[in-house]
Amino acid sequence: GITVTASTDVGPVAAMECVERKIFTTQFHPEVKHSEYGQQLLSNFLFEICGLEPNWSMDNLVETMTAEFRKKVGDDRVILALSGGVDSSVVAALGARAVCKQMTCVFINHGLLRKGEPEQVEEVFTKQFDVDFIHVHAEDRYAELLAGVTEPEEKRRIIGTRFWKEFFAVAQQLETDGKPVKYLAQGTIYPDIIESGARKTGGKTATIKSHHNLIPFPEGVHFDLIEPLDHFFKDEVRALGLALGLPGHIVFRQPFPGPGLAIRIIGAVD
């Protein structure tokens, strides 16, 4: 016997259950912010029905992720692809905690950011974090590559490919005693992977849009990637950012695409 447990004005079955078979389903997203009592619904399912013990804490997660980041990098160097958005900022805070001076934050200015954003990013990450910071002015290079391009997916491909080349150029400059920078850390989160139909979903999801940070490396560019947030959703990333001590104006800032105004503007940006 299946019992309908929730309905709406337009949907006769919003949730249903079969207690005998231990099946509980919803036809909506309880995890999203505008689902009233969604968090309580999930809590009831996990702790009352499944019998899980609530022994997880954000402090424990911070310690675990810091240790994992430190172990991954070892004695090597890492550059952090920093956009100033919440995702890359959280990875920057985590990396600063884990490996400090072994990490260099690299901010690629493609000239398509919000007004005052490059200055704000540099202000925050040179004064609040004990890490090296490099501001790469690549505005002219991007303007030349994007001239006349109107297709959004092509813009993303161009921007993502050029990003890899810019980061690799910085990595080569940072070589010490012939030892290359091995790792590149970036703020890839799970929705990026889902929307791209990318590698970690097993390729079983449809491509909604490609993400510049998931574009394949061009020939001649090679890094080992560190993506500590690749199983996190945005609300979890924000909670982690607060636990790491990031200021609220970074953690709760309005999301903005990595390719910036190139995607917000319809047609060519030249």
Predicted features and spans:
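RNA-binding accessory domains that recognize and position tRNA/RNA substrates
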Residues: G1-K182, A198-D270
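Extended catalytic-interface subdomain
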Residues: Y183-I194
